[in-house]
């Protein structure tokens, strides 16, 4: 058997319409909330029986914006500055022979949504809005937790930035999204090789275009404006 067709069982609804700004790993911004919405064929509550007994879930999904026909045996992890090459299987790079991702998220709730059926509300996901999910498995602590594990070139989440907002800007961010946005920015969404303090970066988040600068270890949000015809991931209502 040389191949196998994976079926999309669900898609995520998140606050990230583009790749820029998505946390580099799941769980590092616990304030981020997303919805897992099942495809019509899999909207069967029996498939979720017992899932409420687990606190965390493992998602297997596709790097849908990074699918390529070819692949390279080595990649350049941003964590190492973008110059050092490592074997693709020694990294979590999206540029893989099979563009599959694995994320552990916290299960916040199981809800009924009109027109969507039963959905899963989760925290800490590192997925772009609309990302296809191929499988969901419960996280089992006794088997999946390894306190003695070593993290190679990424032993921790890295240095965090201090986030400041220009006068009046934070109030433009919906109150329920402020902590999540601050967490995203504190983890420095910039490409690792860009350190120009005069550069203005723009991040699309929760229906807003958020512009910021970084000087040293301080990130300053200079504006947060609503985007035209944009959508917020958890309800898809125009803002």
Give the residues covered by each predicted segment.
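Mixed-charge, low-complexity intrinsically disordered regions
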Residues: 1-100, 112-121, 125-239
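Conserved positions in beta-strands of structured domains
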Residues: 13, 105-108
